[in-house]
């Protein structure tokens, strides 16, 4: 088999480059799984202001440290819930923030967020045009489907993806449910993951048996089962 034939040449490659050479070949890869926020679509600072806007919509007092409290409760919710539900999340905010937050709070909040996207990125569109001509592309994101689909459409990249998998339909990453669905109809060695969060995207994919591309400019971790890229556009060099 090709693995045995390549083993003789292993001295010419570092261990990382060897794994990458073997798994990065377009003769093997058939599907690419993408994370969404901070991977395909940059995170805007204005998104934080949408919390205050939602408080104001419901006439809920917004105190000086409100966002930090809200953010911590959101982290706790994500930590303790494998699957997301808007009404359940709204109640979790109400019970843990201690204010009269209605059951439709998250509906309104995510509605604001879904309309807030950066200007279209022509370079990203060019990359996705190239990748979608060679591979099946899928999004796997730990958030709500209606918001993420809206963002993909507004950003002008929805058409490039065959599936949008979200954590209101499947247990969130790094659990295996979303990876299982994303790999349906493919062998694991035919699928790679691209993401910016080590725990949910990269380690989750590795634990499931996938090779990954880790989008980061600050994390110095390296490994045999993932390749670090500093820009999403770097994928064109490898896939």
Residue ranges of each PLM-predicted region?
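Asp-based, Mg2+/Mn2+-dependent phosphohydrolase catalytic module
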Residues: 2-13, 18-32, 125, 129, ...
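A metal-dependent, Asp-based hydrolase signature
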Residues: 60-61, 75-109
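Active-site neighborhood of HAD-like aspartate-dependent phosphohydrolases
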Residues: 21-69
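Surface-exposed cleft-lining segments at the edges of enzyme active sites
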Residues: 110-117
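Structured helix-beta-strand junction loops
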Residues: 133-134
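Conserved strand-to-helix beginnings and helix N-cap segments that scaffold or border functional pockets
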Residues: 44-47, 121, 151, 176
């Amino acid at each position: 088999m090709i693995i045995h034939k390549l083993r003789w040449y292993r001295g010419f490659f570092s261990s990382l480059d060897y794994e990458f050479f073997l798994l990065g070949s377009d003769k093997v890869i058939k599907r690419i799984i993408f994370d969404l926020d901070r991977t395909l679509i940059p995170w805007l600072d204005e998104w934080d202001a949408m919390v205050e806007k939602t408080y104001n919509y419901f006439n809920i007092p917004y105190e000086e440290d409100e966002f930090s409290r809200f953010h911590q409760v959101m982290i706790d919710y994500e930590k303790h819930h494998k699957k997301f539900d808007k009404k359940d999340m709204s109640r979790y905010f109400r019970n843990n923030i201690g204010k009269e937050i209605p059951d439709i709070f998250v509906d309104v909040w995510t509605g604001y967020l879904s309309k807030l996207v950066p200007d279209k990125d022509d370079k990203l569109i060019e990359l996705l045009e190239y990748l979608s001509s060679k591979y099946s592309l899928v999004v796997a994101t730990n958030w709500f489907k209606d918001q993420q689909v809206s963002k993909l459409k507004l950003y002008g990249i929805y058409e490039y993806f065959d599936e949008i998998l979200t954590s209101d339909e499947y247990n969130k990453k790094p659990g295996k449910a979303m990876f299982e669905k994303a790999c349906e109809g493919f062998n694991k060695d035919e699928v790679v993951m691209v993401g910016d969060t080590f725990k949910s995207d990269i380690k989750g994919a590795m634990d499931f048996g996938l090779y990954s591309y880790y989008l980061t400019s600050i994390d110095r971790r390296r490994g045999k089962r993932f390749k670090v890229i500093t820009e999403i556009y770097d994928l064109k060099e490898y896939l």
